[in-house]
Amino acid sequence: MNNNQLSAQLARQLGAHRHLLVAFSGGLDSSVLLHLLVGLRQQLPDLQLRAVHVHHGLSAFADQWVTHCRQQCVAWQLPLVVQHVQVDSQQGGIEAAARAARYSAFASTLAADETLLTAQHLDDQCETFLLALKRGSGPAGLSAMAAQTSLGNNHLLRPLLGHSRQQLEAYAQQHQLSWIEDDSNQDPRFDRNFLRLQVLPLLNQRWPHFAAATARSASLCAEQEQLLDELLAEQLHNLLDEDRALAIDGLLTCSAARRFALLRRWIALFGVTMPSREQLQRLWEEVALSREDAEPQLQLGQYQFRRFRRRLYLLPLMADLREISLSWSLDDSLMLPDGLGELVSGEGDICLRAPQSQQKVSIRFSAQGKHRILGRAHSRPIKKLWQELGIPPWQRERIPLIYYDDQLIAALGIFVSEAGQTPEGQQPWRLHWRKK
């Protein structure tokens, strides 16, 4: 394929995307992609380009790579953003952690109207397919990398997926491009390197079109997944409420295959790592089908599955706030923990009996014993009150509770206790919960 054909193909893949952020490591693949786009900019004057380089801090040469990328971007007259990240190798291994840190940096760099372009090629697609095969993945995992997908509210394009590394090398040599070589790419302890250095050369020697064949298989798997998406979309929509909680009863009569397919598509809505088949089985048996009076939960990375009133919820892990007690002088606003916002005194639509001069006001996140709230004739245990008011267990510990000394006055936004009622003829104390 000649240069004109490459440029024309790239322009077709871009479609209407004109504001582009290019992931630029300085290696062969991203150097070729960026060079192609710089050339395409001559033909498409409305094309706006930026590059982003992620400094992982894992190599002794990382600073030199930044220098190379800066020099290249100056020569090609386009802005470069350098993002420094910290890689936590405890989170799924060094490769997965570096990738997670990298894509987090991309997401934070993207402007609202920008599309991210990455330079994965045909050989990368083959490696991804084989790694998914090694993990025992189904059609979703074997679909490998999509040529176009979403990244948060932005789009991600991989325009080089149809081209081999050999083709990219030929292009780079023809245009006398310079690029860096990551020293870690020669370490076979990493799974991708092991495949690239030791496995794929043998496969390609025996079957020269092996990478292209695996790419076709990945594409067929992706088609099957798309078909399932279309066939199950209406049923999934009918099982969801406005909070994207999933109705358990609607899954009871499904076959196991259909149930797991629906669970996977529900989980995919949240953009989290897809659980294994074993984890899905545990989700169904230990959470969905647990006793009615239980409060089951199952952790998945930084997320958790919970159940409430015959519905499944997928939630981020939350800090335990039950032991926290915050004194409040009322002269200033009070910042709440764990991103819950702040409380502002003297304004707002929450009206309570004003504290007496000697009473100490505090904010807590747990309560014990029985309480009588406005609108109820009798005192009730706090757990029963939460249940009757329809508050899920994980929300109960994130609702600020107003105390005067050790007396519960109100659960903000939920109820006011009898002790918090403003006596007739007195001015109430107003406050506002400013949520983030």
Curated annotation (Swiss-Prot):
This is tRNA(Ile)-lysidine synthase. Ligates lysine onto the cytidine present at position 34 of the AUA codon-specific tRNA(Ile) that contains the anticodon CAU, in an ATP-dependent manner. Cytidine is converted to lysidine, thus changing the amino acid specificity of the tRNA from methionine to isoleucine. It is found in: Cytoplasm. It comes from Serratia proteamaculans (strain 568). InterPro entries: Lysidine-tRNA-synth_C, Rossmann-like_a/b/a_fold, TilS/TtcA_N, tRNA_Ile_lys_synt, tRNA_Ile_lys_synt_N, tRNA_Ile_lys_synt_subst-bd. One of its GO terms (biological process) is tRNA modification. Belongs to the tRNA(Ile)-lysidine synthase family. GO terms for molecular function: ATP binding; tRNA(Ile)-lysidine synthase activity. ATP binds at S25, G26, G27, L28, D29, S30. It catalyses: cytidine(34) in tRNA(Ile2) + L-lysine + ATP = lysidine(34) in tRNA(Ile2) + AMP + diphosphate + H(+). The N-terminal region contains the highly conserved SGGXDS motif, predicted to be a P-loop motif involved in ATP binding. Keywords: ATP-binding, Cytoplasm, Ligase, Nucleotide-binding, tRNA processing. One of its GO terms (cellular component) is cytoplasm. Disulfide bonds: none annotated. The gene is tilS. The keyword ATP-binding applies. Its main location: cytoplasm. Its EC number is 6.3.4.19. Gene3D superfamilies: 1.20.59.20, HUPs.
